Amino acid sequence: MLPDLAEALQQRRQEGLYRFRQVLEGPQSPRVTIDGRDFLAFCSNDYLGLANHPALIEAVAAGAQRYGVGSGASHLISGHSRAHHELEEALAEFVGLPRTLLFSTGYMANMAVVTALMGREDAIFADRLNHASLNDAALLSRARFIRYPHLDLVTLEKQLKTIQARRRLIVTDAVFSMDGDRAPVAELLALCQRFDAWLLLDDAHGFGVLGEQGKGSLYDPQEVERNVPHLIYMATLGKAAGVSGAFVAAQASMIETLIQHSRTYGYTTAAAPLLAHALLTSLQLISQGVWRRERLVQLIEQLRQKLQSLPWQLLLSDTPIQPLLVGGSREAVRLDQALRERGIWVPAIRPPTVPQGMARLRISLSAAHAGEDVDQLSAALHDLAGC
């Protein structure tokens, strides 16, 4: 069996699909150090530049002083601290939904929702470019799993009309992690109302970045209020929020159902309470950080203007995720390595993360970047393109 594994790994190398971990010597930042060498990084999902914010560092220390380091148990035993509880209440108020439930990761949150609600008699309708966690959750639930072409609501409507099921759940990224485009949330909620379905909205890359005060893809409070019975909102706390974790927000009966039936909630140790304590400060920074979101908009516009003349396709996106489509996996790796030789780190994204023939450089912007950083990246890419 071991020779089979070695052969499969070698095949992966030959196809340009082998992945390596990079060991950072310091905090997450637009400037990182790897093996003693400094890089200008466009890699992380630290969209607001909060991962190394002094106020969060102080909050973590204060949380450790008050709550210690570990939670020691699951939320359902003795691991649910005052910090966890206050964060859940603050998040519910922030996004405008009745209740929230904390999870250690977005993957666990998506798995919890789908497997707790759906079974063999049910149907899940999923955008073809959804995050892997949504796909894995759907498969594990044993529900019927129907995928529709990316953002194709005409096809989705036909599927909802023709496929009968006890329960129906539409699952979608709100901001698609590898393309940077957005799901039409209002239209999806309208379909849920028409066909008596739930919408699980994964806003991992929108929370903190989009909407008023960074409230994410739930930009219209009246729309949210009208659709509470149909809406299940998931967002992560390790991207724009700069810390770690995730939460699900929904009506009270939905949250209670997840507490009772979600295996990834009940059968795991709760995240360290010091993280929840720090996230209360993060939520304040997000709410008050209008200038950070404005800065991001400026950087996005600057980048798109400078990269339009490249021979590679810059996918349409108004979010911090700016994908540069190069096609083949080997070409993506070549460009990744050539940029690193110039002191710039932009990750090559290859199958199976993206479809075959759709390999890309995934440029991630942060409010911590400077305009000069974008200029440096642009100059390097134009040099590599021979422009």
From Swiss-Prot:
Pfam families: Aminotran_1_2
Cofactors named for this entry: pyridoxal 5'-phosphate
EC number, as in UniProt: 2.3.1.47
Residues annotated for substrate binding in this entry: 19, 131, 353
GO molecular function per UniProt: 8-amino-7-oxononanoate synthase activity; pyridoxal phosphate binding
Top-level taxon of origin: Bacteria
Similarity comment: family membership: Belongs to the class-II pyridoxal-phosphate-dependent aminotransferase family. BioF subfamily.
Catalysed reaction equations from the record: 6-carboxyhexanoyl-[ACP] + L-alanine + H(+) = (8S)-8-amino-7-oxononanoate + holo-[ACP] + CO2
Pathway(s) annotated for this protein in UniProt: Cofactor biosynthesis; biotin biosynthesis
GO biological process, one term: biotin biosynthetic process
Keywords for this protein: Biotin biosynthesis, Pyridoxal phosphate, Transferase
Lineage summary: Bacteria, Pseudomonadati, Pseudomonadota, Betaproteobacteria, Nitrosomonadales
Positions that bind pyridoxal 5'-phosphate: 106-107, 177, 205, 236
Organism: Nitrosomonas eutropha (strain DSM 101675 / C91 / Nm57)
Modified residues (N6-(pyridoxal phosphate)lysine): 239
Complexes and interactors: Homodimer.
Chain's role: Catalyzes the decarboxylative condensation of pimeloyl-[acyl-carrier protein] and L-alanine to produce 8-amino-7-oxononanoate (AON), [acyl-carrier protein], and carbon dioxide.
Official protein name in the record: 8-amino-7-oxononanoate synthase
